[in-house]
Amino acid sequence: AYTVTLYLQG
């Protein structure tokens, strides 16, 4: 999931 990736990157 793309949005989750951005969330984990901070």
Swiss-Prot record:
It catalyses: Endohydrolysis of (1->6)-alpha-D-glucosidic linkages in dextran. Optimum temperature is 35 degrees Celsius. One of its GO terms (biological process) is polysaccharide catabolic process. Optimum pH is 4.5. One of its GO terms (molecular function) is dextranase activity. The keyword Protease does not apply. Keywords: Carbohydrate metabolism, Glycosidase, Hydrolase, Polysaccharide degradation. Its EC number is 3.2.1.11. On the 2D-gel the determined pI of this protein is: 4.5, its MW is: 158 kDa. This is Dextranase.
